[in-house]
Amino acid sequence: MSAKDVKFHDSARARIVKGVNVLADAVKVTLGPKGRNVVIERSFGAPTITKDGVSVAKEIELKDRFENMGAQIVKQVASKTADVAGDGTTTATVLAQAIVQEGMKHVAAGMNPMDLKRGIDKAVAAVLDELRKLSKPISTNREIAQVGSISANADEAIGKIIADAMEKVGKEGVITVEDGKSLENELDVVEGMQFDRGYVSPYFINDPEKQAAYLDDALILLHDKKISNIRDLLPVLEATSKAGKPLLIVAEDIDGEALATLVVNAMRGILKVAAVKAPGFGDRRKAMLEDIAILTGATVISEETGKQLQKASLEDLGSAKRVEVRKEDTIIIDGAGDQERIEARVKSIRTQIDETTSDYDREKLQERVAKLAGGVAVIKVGAATEVEMKEKKDRVDDALHATRAAVEEGIVPGGGVALLRARSTATSLKGANSDQDAGIQIVLRALEAPLRVIASNAGDEPSVVIAKVLEGKGNFGYNAATGEYGDLVEAGVVDPTKVTRTALQNAASIAGLILTTDATVADAPKDEKPAQAPAPELEY
């Protein structure tokens, strides 16, 4: 085990705060409509240019081990906020830095860090309650576009394309972001169910130009086990051949003799067939097979249902107007399932969404609802260069998460104004002692930080801007894009409540941990001696 370097008290905290400041200062230049770019070096290829706070935070590693601890702790604020809300990473980092800086002054003055933390937590809880009261739900296409535009750094084209996508596939629909082939952003809507499994063998391709297998008016066989023996498949193959229809086989896996026979018949044109692996794993795979069965009117051939592959008939097969099978995915369009059964299935999955406590499970269940109820929208991001494409794609991802968050919990006035207005309830709060009162005051001052940074990045004097905003009420605030004051909601400067709430919660949580730190432990630097120079060669 290597030797450790240990620091205590003020010495430990000072180095951590230095790391916090380095990371936060690099991230906060991106905040607001007039935020600046950050250029990040890449070991290979061109550097990345970004205005995305979390992308900047993820790249920062400091040489000093103790300072790096501070940077990595604050990096967690950005990452956690991005995971939960998808945006607000820069705001969260700015708030964390402000709480840490204010708090350290009080700790240095001899106040009890634990009481300061209790005061901070008390003030944050009051502010969060007020934020929920300020929040208003969004419903119109225009409001959704406004949220998307703000999150994409005032890019109205991105806001509009996200609003159009949500209108077409529903607010719970699946919206994916891909690299485009042109200079303009494009929106493609895929009707039907798409899942991320492609053909088992490229020999099933019947359109070499598009590298895909297209099956029109196809029958669909669903099996939850591996198919290796061709004898098991023969009854189904003979029945579909007589019916003169193409066949899609979805199974756990298809290999050996069964795959070889299908490939040979497909290549000779005797059978129009394609085989894909079933999507998902374990219980999720069973559920998704059942979804496909309900969508297409099929029965899953499974031991649990008492069905055997050898005895399967045409009645057990589903059908769809068109099936598209590519290398990475399969799309089933216009399945022949019963509409009432599909609606009942969607209702059942929505109940599971309400009951689940896991964010991952919730996301997967929402995807299943979207695939059954709507379609899949694909936003293709257009740009002139690869560097611009990556930067733009990051902004579209941010905007997409922000609009979903806004639909979920509503919106509040943007530009840092919501936090200023929400602190009104905390001004009258009292702690159990003077140290807790100081903790409450730390939060009240820190809530000004996002607006200060937005104003500073726009080239205005922060103190003047804050004084002017505090003179007004409600949605009145500073629009950094135009440099004017007015009703921010009316001007379309709004933030999702979930983003603002998550940013404050995570910032206060991490800042509280830093303030209550009293020792730090890191690997001691190794004393590596320089390599010995080789002996000179003797000349003869």
Swiss-Prot record:
It is an enzyme of class 5 (isomerase). Its EC number is 5.6.1.7. GO terms for cellular component: cytoplasm. ATP binds at residues 30-33, 51, 87-91, 415, 479-481, 495. PROSITE patterns: CHAPERONINS_CPN60. One of its GO terms (biological process) is protein refolding. Keywords: ATP-binding, Chaperone, Cytoplasm, Isomerase, Nucleotide-binding. Coiled coil: none annotated. It is found in: Cytoplasm. It comes from the Bacteria. One of its GO terms (molecular function) is isomerase activity. It catalyses: ATP + H2O + a folded polypeptide = ADP + phosphate + an unfolded polypeptide. Belongs to the chaperonin (HSP60) family. Forms a cylinder of 14 subunits composed of two heptameric rings stacked back-to-back. Interacts with the co-chaperonin GroES. Together with its co-chaperonin GroES, plays an essential role in assisting protein folding. The GroEL-GroES system forms a nano-cage that allows encapsulation of the non-native substrate proteins and provides a physical environment optimized to promote and accelerate protein folding. HAMAP family: CH60. NCBIfam families: GroEL (TIGR02348), PRK00013.1 (NF000592), PRK12849.1 (NF009487), PRK12850.1 (NF009488), PRK12851.1 (NF009489). This is Chaperonin GroEL 3. It comes from Burkholderia ambifaria (strain ATCC BAA-244 / DSM 16087 / CCUG 44356 / LMG 19182 / AMMD).
